[in-house]
Amino acid sequence: MNFDKKQLRNTLLLLLGALIWGTAFVAQSVGSGYVGPYTFLAARSWLACAFLIVLVLLRRGKARKADPGVPFWINGRMLLRGGVFCGIALFAASAAQQIGIGTTSTAKAGFLTALYVVLVPLLGVFFGRRPGVKLGICACISLAGLYLLCLAGHDTLTLTGGEWMLLLCSLLFAFQIMLVDHYSPRLDGVQLSFAEFFATAVLSTIFMFVFETPTFAQIQGAAVSIAYCGILSSGVAYTLQIVGQKELDPTIASMAMCMESVFSALAGWLILGQTLSGVELAGCALMCAAIMGAQIPEKVRS
């Protein structure tokens, strides 16, 4: 059985991003105790921009040394469009998540947010990216595993007002994944990530000054959380998403990214001493099986 090496590599990049997002959950929770959602999002986004522009300068400087005629910004107009559209989607999804996350349990919040694992294949039909039977089955298996991990024995599926915001968040994240799928093959991954976070930072800053009154002391209190989320969760993990989604089916990408829930649970188990029941471990196993099943090449009919 011959696996697609590029697909496997890109899936592993997305899994690494999901690992960073999963372990960043504690940092986000701590940071939210000091500053409002828009302040936290603005601070981490500007920090991500600072981190990414250094990478852009280093990479483009090296490329222009080899060929002085190479433009600094690759496909500038498309980069502007992609950065704005992806940034708006990321800002809206992150804001909806932050607003809704305080209204329900962590388990239900994790489940509702990660529902993009089934929304992406559905949106793919409208974007001309039909997932196929195998990937559709794998997405459903991943959803079943997500339910066992997050909700089995804990919550009902009755939704409150804030939980509808989390459902909206999952739809917006699905759109963001599809937008990255559209733009990433045509653009430099690091440059697109910078443009995306620049748009997110500008929008977050506007909303911060309209709806919140942050102080320097508050931001200082959340500094460690902002640094972790800004550099690793935003600067590194979302860049891994953009690079990893190149030439990868968005359904596989969504399954890899929703492994964030598994890594978050495992981090709590290993680092914080939290317990995982047999049902929750079975959910983790199902989600891992779905990811591995998605890597198996389909038989080509002659």
Show where each model-derived region lies:
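Hydrophobic transmembrane alpha-helices of multi-pass small-molecule transport proteins
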Residues: 52, 131-152, 170-173, 204, ...
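Hydrophobic/aromatic residues within transmembrane alpha-helices
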Residues: 31, 40, 44, 100, ...
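C-terminal-most transmembrane helix of multi-pass membrane proteins
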Residues: 3, 45, 56, 60-61, ...
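C-terminal transmembrane-helix exit sites in multi-pass transporters
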Residues: 51-56, 116-137, 262-281
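Helix-helix packing/entry segments at the starts of transmembrane helices
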Residues: 18, 43, 109-115, 179-201, ...
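Specific transmembrane alpha-helical segments of multi-pass solute transporters/efflux pumps
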Residues: 20, 24-25, 53, 59-113, ...
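Hydrophobic alpha-helical transmembrane segments of multi-pass integral membrane proteins
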Residues: 8-13, 39-58, 80-81, 135-144, ...
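Glycine-/small-residue-enriched transmembrane alpha-helix faces in small-molecule transporters
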Residues: 1-43, 87-88, 92, 96, ...
